[in-house]
A protein has these predicted regions:
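Residue-level recognition of secondary-structure-to-loop junctions
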Residues: 1, 8-12, 16
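Short strand-edge motifs at loop-to-beta-strand transitions and within beta-strands
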Residues: 4-7, 32, 58-60, 148
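Noncatalytic accessory or regulatory domains flanking protease catalytic cores in secreted, cell-surface
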Residues: 9-12, 25-26, 110-186
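Hydrophobic/tyrosine-rich beta-strand signature of extracellular beta-sandwich/beta-rich modules
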Residues: 16, 20-22
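C-terminal edge beta-strand
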Residues: 28-38, 179-181
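Extracellular interdomain linker/stem segments of modular secreted and single-pass surface proteins
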Residues: 37-45
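Short beta-strand segments enriched in hydrophobic/aromatic residues
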Residues: 38, 83-87, 168
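Acidic, Ser/Thr/Pro-rich low-complexity intrinsically disordered segments
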Residues: 54-131
């Protein structure tokens, strides 16, 4: 038995149609077509984000491709960002002495479409509600999700190169435990 191995490298997330053809020693062959879904998970750990010292927030941007092509069936199902960071800034300096309000960290995720239009953000989530997933007691966990059939549709914000942005509006530099971006195709 002999065969051929095909290796795919550096594929964009999405849907791909492939065909496998098997030919026996007598020259008879059969072909089977399948669809392969290439998903993506990117995780960044131990980040730091600067403080808002000039009355404008500090952003760290992460771009990702999204495809929503109903004609070919190459459609993103979901894009999600998961942000985890410590609740308290460990090297905090009280701006208003004794107040301590600036020591309680609050970092948000913002999502922008391919034309830099803001689609959604986590800023309305209260400090006590930042417990998405398996969030430990001393960390905050926020999640921002976009669904393919709604967010990436032609009638809404469209597909293309989207951006997930970590935003710090606080005065303090803050640590970030991790950011995970997941792209899932059907």
């Amino acid at each position: 038995m002999t065969g051929q191995t095909v290796e795919w490298k550096e594929l964009e997330p999405g849907e791909y149609k492939i065909a496998l053809t098997v030919t026996n020693g007598a020259g008879l062959s059969a072909t089977d077509e399948v669809i392969v879904y290439v998903n993506y998970v990117g995780r960044w750990s131990d980040l730091s984000i600067g403080g808002n010292t000039s009355n404008s927030p500090v952003d760290i941007e992460f771009s990702f491709p999204s495809t929503q092509n109903q004609e070919t069936g190459n459609t993103i199902k979901r894009a999600a960002g998961e942000l985890i960071y410590p609740k308290e800034d460990e090297d905090c300096t009280d701006v208003v002495f004794g107040d301590g309000n600036n020591c309680r960290a609050k970092i948000d995720l913002y999502g922008f479409n391919s034309t830099d239009e803001q689609v959604a953000n986590t800023s309305a989530i209260g400090l006590e509600q930042r417990t998405y997933g398996d969030c430990e007691e001393n960390t905050d966990c926020v999640w921002l999700q976009f669904t393919g059939s709604y967010h990436f549709a032609e009638s809404q914000w469209k597909d293309g190169e989207w951006t997930m942005t970590i935003r710090n509006e606080m005065v303090n530099d803050l640590d970030i435990e991790s950011l995970t971006i997941r792209l899932l195709y059907k």
